[in-house]
Amino acid sequence: MLNFKEDEKLYNLNHSCAHLMAQAVKHLYPDAKFWVGPVIETGFYYDIDLGDKVITEEDIPAIEKEMKKIAKDGKRIVRHEISKEEALEMFKDDPYKLDLIERMDENETVISCYSQGDFTDLCRGGHVDTVKECKNFKLLKFSGAYWKGDTNNKVLQRIYGVCLPTEEELNAYLQELEEAKERDHRKIGKDLGIYMMSDLVGRGLPMYLPNGFTLWNLLETYIRDKEIKRGYVHVQTPPLGNVNLYKTSGHLEHYKDAMFPIMQVEDEEYVLRPMNCPHHMVMYSNELHSYRDLPLRIAEIARDCRYESSGSLKGIERVRTFCQNDCHIFCTPEQIESEFKGVVDLILEVYRELGIKNYKFELSLRDPEDKVKYHQDDEMWNLAENKLRDVLNDLGIDYEEKIGEAAFYGPKLDVQVQPAVGNEITLSTCQLDFCLPMKFDLKYTDKDGEKKTPVVIHRAILGTLDRAIAFYLEETKGNLPLWLAPVQVSVLPVNNEYHLEYANEIVEKLRELGIRVQLNASDEKLSYRMREDQIKKIPIMLVLGNNERDERTVTLRLHGEEQKNMTLDEFLTYVKDKNDSKALDL
């Protein structure tokens, strides 16, 4: 998919088209007032106050028609520079623009505006030369958005759109968007019965249905078994803690905006935890440790809660409560490289076995100029960042450095993936931390009997299970590998009167093998039942008629398409082997 923020020409084109849309809206609704209209990864949007008018699907064609009329007129897009006083006078009737102007830096004495015909907007640019260049556009959708993202403010109307240089490119992109909608985990999750949301329960609080929780448990067991084979130990800690825990860790200072409000419980203050590391630090300090005990790899599938604005929530990809595939490796400085390599190796192994191919590595470093966000210790940061660079270079892994993206306590390696809709997301992470062990005064005894501070490696191979499931549903288009499918086999007798007994026999044999099987023997026509199973993306459908019953065979449909015939015994061996080997294909 194109990224309109990263391509300068597409950025300028979509920026200008946002102004074109605003101009058209102003023509149709003269009282309209405008907040901001930025370029985003998938095009642009503009937040608009239309008073009592609510934009509906029926209004979009009229706006597009007016946009085409303005574009055909071909006015030049002209930049002006005015003083702050002139800007305040120009936009005196628009409270949203006044707010932008008044919040500008005091040293910003010159303000830029862009005009096209009868429309002028505050803007830094860039833009194309004329509105005629914006003729190949499409308005995509509309929604509500709180002014400034604050739920206490008025809801503005947000209209999304996209613009491409040619009609052919626009049509191709719109086709990509349609395909992306089909891959969106929110659609697939509904079709497959993975999870549900309820406003009564709360926004961003997913509830996993039987199919979803089956998938969850399979992934959890898979990653836990991987960790056990690599010497991890698993623990369980509570999903909240005393506020002093987060003062000690520094989360309250550096991460408070992402935390839920503090709760008063009798004479103590508690908070829902946003991360698990403070609990694991305390757990490490429960015992005395020798260098012989290290590395100590403490892992947990842990429940966390983070405050996310309602506008940022997205299915189960971005939620307010989630379970993290977390681990903290306590090690000596000499063990950093081998442990870090072990984590990267595990990430690559898991991705290979799950068939995840499209990803990239990003090395997130601190911004040395930021004295607020990061723990201040230049020697520690330089050592940590160089260690991670050395490991990645030794492994021959291509990576991109991201300045200012590190955690407050240390640099990190993130694995980025592209979901069907929206921005890139982090799937896996590995972070080096010299800071938290010092904050919690953690120690181990070295071979000379001296007390030393361990290093901590934070890592999450699948990130959060919620996000991993969301991404994997999109990556596979819902066609999960057999071993991960909530329902692996659906048995469909053609006629219950004649074929149900044979169908029940097969169901029992499959259950004895540990295969998740359903009997689809409703009174509906066979074609309807098959379509039903196709929508649910059940990997294997067994259609049983007279021939299959009489010859003790089965007719398989694999992912609703390829058809095979086998004896019953051959099929039982086949499906068990595919399941046990965690095969990606059928």
List where the protein language model places each region.
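NTP/phosphate- and nucleic-acid-binding module
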Residues: 1-35, 39-586
